[in-house]
Design a protein with these regions (language model features):
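Rossmann-fold NAD(P)-dependent oxidoreductase module
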Residues: 23, 115, 119
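A conserved beta-strand/loop capping segment in the N-terminal third of enzymes
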Residues: 58-112
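Conserved Rossmann-like nucleotide-cofactor binding loop
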Residues: 16, 39, 165
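Short, well-ordered alpha-helix to beta-strand connector turns
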Residues: 6, 28, 155-156
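Glycine-rich FAD pyrophosphate-binding loop
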Residues: 25-45
Length: 230
């Protein structure tokens, strides 16, 4: 089995893992960013990102923030349209985009994650390992050994960012799913969806039969929409 030595191994190359890797780059550390999939890859998501996401990109790097502005598979969205069980409508606009680093937007998760992953992969000291599903982890004499089917990673630190179904969370902690405080959702993409708010407000529909859940309809580029129930 191939052995690779690093200062930090980051398990998961989604937004959390990429943010960690990006911020650790150029700090004199050798970083492994490991993911079980190959990018671009999809994740079930509502696809709406608030203005704070844009703000965090500015705090991380002005270059990263500028590249996000040029990322063209997104549409700006700076408000919410609520639909009540009695079909009444309420539109709430967020703070003006120019006051919050450019405001929020909606982008398919497959596109946004691939953008962030690609930007992170350009940074120095970051070594990318795709299609490497982690199968074991041990803490051995001041070093952590993380193994996939073909590679053994040795590191001083392991950052766990492997998502909602985290193998490492189950392996390293006693955390369990609290069924009384757990929710799930379904999502589908639709084409030729029209008549959104002129400023692309996301829509949250609350219907008696599904409370406390709700239906969401979020606009996407090209007259597409992310429609889900959660």
């Amino acid at each position: 089995m191939q052995t690779e030595k690093f200062d930090v191994v980051i398990a998961g190359a989604g937004p959390a893992g990429c943010a960690a890797a990006y911020m650790l780059s150029e700090k004199g550390l050798k970083i492994a960013l490991v993911d079980k999939d190959t990018f671009p890859r999809d994740k079930i998501c509502g696809d709406a990102l608030g203005a704070d996401v844009t703000k965090q990109f500015h705090l991380m790097s002005e270059t990263l923030a500028a590249n996000l502005q040029q990322f063209d598979t997104k549409i700006p969205s700076n408000g919410v349209r609520f639909i009540t069980p009695k079909h009444r409508q309420l539109d709430i606009a967020f703070t003006k985009p120019e006051k919050v680093f450019g405001g929020g937007f909606v982008a398919k998760r497959i596109d946004f994650d691939n953008f962030f992953f690609s930007e992170t992969a350009k940074q120095p000291d970051i070594f990318i390992f795709q299609n490497q599903k982690i199968v074991s982890v041990t803490n051995n004499q001041n070093k952590i050994i993380v193994q996939s089917a073909s590679i053994s990673f040795e590191a001083s630190m392991l950052l766990v960012a492997d998502g909602a179904h985290s193998f490492l969370n189950k392996k390293l902690t006693e955390n369990v799913v609290e069924k009384d405080h757990f929710c799930a959702g379904v999502r589908q993409y639709y084409s030729n969806v029209k008549d959104f708010h002129p400023e692309n407000h996301i829509e949250l529909h609350f219907y008696k039969d599904i409370l406390p859940g709700y239906l969401w309809i979020f606009p996407l580029p090209g007259n597409q929409a992310n429609v889900g129930l959660g």
